[in-house]
A protein has these predicted regions:
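Generic beta-sheet signal
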Residues: 25-27, 55, 153-161
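A short acidic, often aromatic-flanked loop/helix-cap motif at beta-alpha or helix-coil junctions
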Residues: 93-97, 137-142, 187-188
Length: 188
């Protein structure tokens, strides 16, 4: 069974949809880095049937967190290669403090095949806090929770773990200590 998106793309390509139903002057795509093969096929079908349609795709290839379900920033990159396309880098960050942004910039320089090339600049006054902690032991949770408790009044924190199991254990401990937490995990 095809998804609704794949079926719509197929119907448009085969001329099974009335032109007035798909005739658009502007198409805005938010979170374009999260497009998968089906969404891209639908976009291509709409573009092919609306030659004058203006496409505005907004996305951040560094924030593609849905690869596990088939999204690929390459589809957004392909749009930048279209004839007449214009690529605009938005480099000002109003959400994060200086240290996290600089840390992320350092990490992102090591990634191949990025669309953006200009480093991000924090526009906030706060310096922020970044700490990389590596533990060789399976008993890493308590020291990490204690460190987060020390910084809990200084803003939002993020913890990256190697496995989903580690993330679940850590979240339970944080909640036990009264720290509101949210689990974001892959489906692996």
């Amino acid at each position: 069974a095809k998804s609704v998106v794949a079926k719509a793309a197929e119907m448009i390509c085969q001329g099974e949809v009335e032109p007035n139903k798909i005739g658009k002057t502007v198409l805005v795509i938010d979170e374009a880095q999260d497009m998968g093969v089906e969404e891209y096929a639908l976009l291509r079908a709409l573009m092919a049937n609306n030659e004058e349609m203006r496409v505005i795709a907004v996305g951040d290839d560094d924030q593609n967190i849905y690869e596990f379900r088939g999204s690929d920033s390459d589809y957004m990159y392909r749009l930048t290669q279209e004839s007449g396309s214009k690529f605009v880098e938005m480099t000002e960050n109003y959400r994060s403090a200086h240290h996290p942004v600089n840390f992320a910039n350092g990490f992102l320089r090591t990634i191949d095949k990025r669309i953006k090339s200009t480093p991000i600049i924090s526009m906030r006054k706060e310096e922020g806090w970044v700490e990389v902690t590596r533990h060789q032991s399976k008993y890493m949770y308590q020291p990490l929770v204690e460190k987060l408790l020390q910084h809990k009044d200084k803003g939002t924190s993020c913890v990256l773990t190697q496995t989903n199991e580690e993330a679940v254990i850590l979240m339970a401990l944080l909640r036990k200590h009264g720290i509101n937490s949210k689990l974001i995990q892959s489906m692996d």
